[in-house]
Amino acid sequence: MIGKVCVITGSRAEYGLLRLLMQGIDTDPNLTLQIIATGSHLSKDFGLTYQEIENDGFKIDCKIEIQKHSDSPPDIAETMGRGISGCGRAFEELQPDLIVLLGDRYEILAAAAAALVAKIPVAHIHGGEVTAGAFDDALRHSITKMSHIHFVATEKSRKRVIQLGEDPNSVFLVGGLGVDAIKNIELLKREELENKLGIKFLNKNLLVTFHPETLGSQAPEKQFEELLDALDFFEDTSLIFTMPNADTGGKKITKMIEEFVETHSNAYFYKSLGQQKYLSVIAQVDGVIGNSSSGLLEVPTFKKGTINIGNRQLGREQSLSVINCKPLMESIKLALEQLYSIDFGLIVSESINPYGEGGASLRILSIIQELSLVEITKKTFYDL
């Protein structure tokens, strides 16, 4: 049986998805929750979001500082090296029976590599997905090959994980964790949200989250400039920007947001909204725009439209509530016009989130409770 379950989180968004599962592990008398916080959680630039974990009542067993001040490719490579080394030492100290990882970030790849050489089994969540415009795609599939148990969100993802050579008996279709978070959190009302954030919602409101497209041929800052040029035409719209991630080009995008907000009274910028405020904002805005996975995984549950810019999420399963457009000003303007059209509103109202209707955290917990360490540590390549 599993005893000590170590959950590793490297970003604010990732923790928001894991929180409900962590609560379930923590309250199980037969399991011991261990938490490692790393990556942007420990960075002042990203709002020291490890504090959100502690504010939720969790004890962080180990903090591993790996983030460099620069987001250049050499510095990200060094960050990954620090992550492997730091996780290796943490695993030696904590001696977990199972490591739980989510997603496709390079911090998570580092943790998986450290677990591999330490011979500690890994449970990976949200594997098998495709995002052809980012190197996260290769990282995700690499993490899959270093993992022993797979909790996937869709049937297509389940088939892909098996196609990668994983035993079908180790791949569990549980749905998306993002839907769980929405179903199990008390959202703030509009006025309450305005007071907490110091903003004023207008007749039209948009949430903007844009990350670097790491495999794109066009520089991330050029793509983002096209978005800002398009948003310049919407002076009657409240624009709420969130922080880009720590990939190469993220710091340039952050600077561009700060400069835009300084000259636009209808624009606001937050390093970290926290899960409750973030989901509450989605509930209040007309739609989201950018290239974040949240626009595909979570926003459809709110029956809100998503404008997905560029190829960062190319290949990921989508709801009919998603509008895809090129990272060009005119294309983005047309997408915004479509977002506010009556016909598209009807489509959104009848759309379905392909990542399920909730319950993933409980499904994952029930499977972890029944795992046998002897069985899951034996891996062979499964041929189709």
Question: Which residues are covered by each model-predicted region?
Answer:
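Nucleotide-activated sugar donor-binding and catalytic core shared by glycosyltransferases
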Residues: M1-L384
